[in-house]
Amino acid sequence: MMGQSFFYSMPRTLCNSQGPCTILAGRVGVVFADGKEANPSTGIYIHHILTSDSTKKQKPWLSNCGNSNTPALNIAGLLGGTAFVGTGEDSAERGTVYTSEDGTRNSGYHVGAQDTFTGWAQLVNYNKEAKKIYVFYDLEWIPGIVGDDVKTATFTATCGGSPMIKLSTTGPTNTTSGKFHFLEDGNILGARGHLHGMIFSFLSVTHNRLTGFQ
């Protein structure tokens, strides 16, 4: 098993190559050179793929947990700018929607003509041989700036490491975060979780020892 983390930049290569655009929905994933989607059944595991519009700046709308005056730690925002579509293997089936599910809400993710996107992918290859894969973006969009610009946030429910996630060898356990506070009025269009902090052991096929992976 081999894991790899890499960063990439996409200057005006999504929907804004001909001018500004509005994205209604999107999904990100990885494929092989023949176009077949790479997933655990083919030996490729996505720990996460994060994307950020590095040019776009938004005022935070959600607080950090346990502190109503401090903005939430924006994980994708670590790339700079505003969070865009992302995925983890436990949340890869459905993408992100920037309007209502039926598409009637007049809103979307606004992208300027000069906006540049940055991506951060962490992948694991369970195959014995190296594999060449490609990151893909499947977007539903319309030309121009249309409707309300949605706001996004990618944050940690453990407030950046405190409280620690509770673990148990005897059965289920719960970890409760501090309270999050909304910093402005609005409507939530969607949300999904992504598990972090899981540590497991496996038998190394080359060194006959137990190895930890996070």
Name each model-derived stretch.
Residues 1-214:
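Beta-strand-centric surfaces of beta-sandwich/beta-rich domains
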